[in-house]
């Protein structure tokens, strides 16, 4: 039975698609003979076009930053979880580093965990459970009702990311997805998604990095606009 979710943006609820929707979701890997090789000019042109699709979603990224501020600065002092595969794993860790450390201005640290960074847990889960459990089991362990999970997938079809989105929603965790072109299973499984309209993996990843920085900028703006809700600590003023 599909389970409806609560949209934090106030929109109508939808149902999580049944598991069969996510079968056979691994991205196709082109062979050397069929792969189109881009020149530098081609790459820049593809990035320029993809940034146009991102520009149309700036309001969504601003809302995400404000949402993170509400969750991480709220009475429960919630947590951000983040995950992805390959290059998206590195970007997930980049996001959590910006919150535990800082983005621009000095401010207190906030709780943010990258689910790809703890190798012992990753290998233990991969050894003992199906591959789709790689992130989902960590979400169940670390996430709490009201927390936020950010998932990155250039294809939007990574089975372990989709499984993590489903597990998070079952546990009251808001899921935000950064993906490639829509429609895709991860965007459908998330509470909200920013989808980059480009067929090139590298271009999508580059736009995801811009999106992450925009989220951090919106987060900082929301936090620093209301300093009273952020407890001061020994780290303030310690930046070199």
Pin down the residues of each PLM region.
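Generic N-terminal amphipathic, Lys/Arg-enriched alpha-helix
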Residues: 5, 13-57
């Amino acid at each position: 039975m599909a389970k409806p979710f609560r949209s934090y943006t106030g929109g109508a609820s939808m149902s999580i698609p049944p598991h069969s929707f996510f079968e056979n979701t691994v991205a196709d890997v082109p062979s050397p003979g069929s792969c189109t090789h881009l020149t530098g000019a081609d790459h820049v042109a593809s990035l320029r076009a993809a940034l146009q699709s991102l520009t149309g979603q700036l309001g969504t990224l601003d809302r995400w930053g404000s949402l993170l501020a509400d969750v991480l600065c709220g009475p429960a002092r919630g947590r951000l979880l983040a995950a992805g595969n390959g290059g998206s794993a590195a970007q997930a860790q980049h996001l959590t580093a910006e919150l535990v450390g800082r983005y621009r201005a000095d401010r207190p640290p906030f709780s943010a965990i990258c689910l790809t960074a703890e190798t012992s847990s990753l290998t233990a889960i991969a050894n003992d459970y199906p591959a789709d459990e790689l992130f989902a089991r960590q979400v169940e362990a670390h996430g709490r009702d009201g927390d936020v999970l950010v998932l990155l997938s250039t294809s939007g079809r990574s089975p372990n990311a989709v499984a993590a989105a489903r597990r998070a929603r079952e546990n009251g965790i808001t899921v935000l997805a950064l993906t490639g072109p829509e429609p895709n299973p991860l965007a459908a499984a998330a509470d909200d998604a920013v989808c980059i309209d480009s067929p090139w993996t590298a271009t999508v990843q580059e736009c995801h990095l811009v999106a992450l920085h925009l989220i951090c900028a919106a987060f900082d703006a929301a936090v620093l606009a209301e300093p009273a809700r952020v407890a001061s600590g020994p780290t303030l003023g310690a930046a070199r």
